[in-house]
Amino acid sequence: MSKRDYYEVLGVGRDASEREIKKAYKRLAMKYHPDRNPGDKEAEASFKEVKEAYEILTDTDKKAAYDQFGHAGVDPNRGGGGFGGGGDFGDIFGDVFGDIFGGGRRGGQRQAARGSDLRYNLELSLEEAVRGLTKELKVPTLVGCDSCDGSGAKKGSSATTCGTCHGMGQVQMRQGFFAVQQTCPTCHGRGKIIKDPCSKCHGNGRVEKTKTLSVKIPAGVDTGDRIRLAGEGEAGEFGAPPGDLYVQVTVREHPIFVRDGNNLYCEVPISFAKAALGGEIEVPTLDGKVSLKIPAETQTGRMFRLRGKGVKSVRSHAVGDLLCKVVMETPVNLSERQKELLREFEASLTGESKKHSPKAEGFFDGVKKFFQDLNN
């Protein structure tokens, strides 16, 4: 199962305060704690997930790294910290609750953790998103160490079970009537001791590497779409399965078109004369220019639909439309002769406004009636 977003795990928004995060954590930790759900593996997994999310989102540096890079930004082996808990019921529970449930040692030996999922933010132009393409991505990640085959131990040696926690990665400390589960101080939660570590990975079993992946982006993707590449996340601990890579798509704003689902919108300026007399204009599409017939007496703001000139759906393969809104442009920088012609034209309409400008006439009739009603 893929590692979920930490904010989603705690049920809070990305702008949640630390107080809101702690409140959500306490509620969920009480709900899923294994002592309240004995033998329930799903509850146990949920508890670990909640604990991990809380550790990251209440640490300022880790939270900033996670917000920017996702799970890849908080890996313990990436040079400056990151999430370092092993994945069992670490000391965070003891810090917040003091193990109010008590209870004995649970489970068998700790299993190596699956690799973390990675997120890659990919920005595309509208043209790239509409047509689809193959992108080459360079992804910094952790891969299994080829020197020790991911074991962390020098060739010819092997890891041994930790004698302190007997392979569980956790130890139980009693404080009066209460028992507190804490990360084993000897193996640091791994459950195993590597006495002769690999010189290349220093006993981690994984090393940093930038992978180059060729990713096919399907035609029709849009902002918010996510492409999953199974097994292309970080290598798991000591031979455990790798995580997945999620390519998060963002489409840049376009200077001409606005996308809404599978439809495209654009505004096309037309002259006063073209709007009044009609004619043909050229409008842009993603496939080039096309001719659009404008009928006489077209009003500004009228929408024209060009069917099949939109975006092909990435799911249904249906093709949307291009909707062109014509906007009448008022002429500027007129010569005296041009202004004179417009005055003559305006004068020729005097007394015939109902015929030539019915909307304006109706509007002013309504205004006149409004003020008459006020005075009565």
From Swiss-Prot:
Read off the domain note. The J domain is necessary and sufficient to stimulate DnaK ATPase activity. Zinc center 1 plays an important role in the autonomous, DnaK-independent chaperone activity of DnaJ. Zinc center 2 is essential for interaction with DnaK and for DnaJ activity.
Q: Where are the zinc fingers (CR-type)?
A: 132-210
Q: Which domain of life is it from?
A: Bacteria
Q: Which gene encodes it?
A: dnaJ
Q: Matching CDD domains, A to Z?
A: DnaJ (cd06257), DnaJ_C (cd10747), DnaJ_zf (cd10719)
Q: Does the keyword Zinc-finger apply?
A: yes
**Which GO cellular component terms, listed alphabetically, does the Swiss-Prot or TrEMBL entry include?**
cytoplasm
Q: Which GO terms describe its molecular function?
A: ATP binding; heat shock protein binding; unfolded protein binding; zinc ion binding
Know the name of this protein? Chaperone protein DnaJ
Q: Which HAMAP family match?
A: DnaJ
* Xref: SUPFAM superfamilies: Chaperone J-domain (SSF46565), DnaJ/Hsp40 cysteine-rich domain (SSF57938), HSP40/DnaJ peptide-binding domain (SSF49493)
Enumerate the residues binding Zn(2+) 2. C162, C165, C184, C187
List residues of the J domain. 5-70
Please report the residue spans annotated as repeat (CXXCXGXG motif): 145-152, 162-169, 184-191, 198-205
UniProt remark on cofactor binding: Binds 2 Zn(2+) ions per monomer.
- Please list the residues that bind Zn(2+) 1: C145, C148, C198, C201
Kindly list the biological process annotations in GO that this record carries: chaperone cofactor-dependent protein refolding; DNA replication; protein refolding; response to heat
Summarize the subunit comment: Homodimer.
Query: What is the role of this chain?
Result: Participates actively in the response to hyperosmotic and heat shock by preventing the aggregation of stress-denatured proteins and by disaggregating proteins, also in an autonomous, DnaK-independent fashion. Unfolded proteins bind initially to DnaJ; upon interaction with the DnaJ-bound protein, DnaK hydrolyzes its bound ATP, resulting in the formation of a stable complex. GrpE releases ADP from DnaK; ATP binding to DnaK triggers the release of the substrate protein, thus completing the reaction cycle.
Q: Name one Pfam family in it.
A: DnaJ_CXXCXGXG
Q: Cofactors per UniProt? A: Zn(2+)
Q: Which UniProt keywords apply?
A: Chaperone, Cytoplasm, DNA replication, Metal-binding, Repeat, Stress response, Zinc, Zinc-finger
What is its subcellular localisation?
Cytoplasm
**What family does the database annotate?**
Belongs to the DnaJ family.
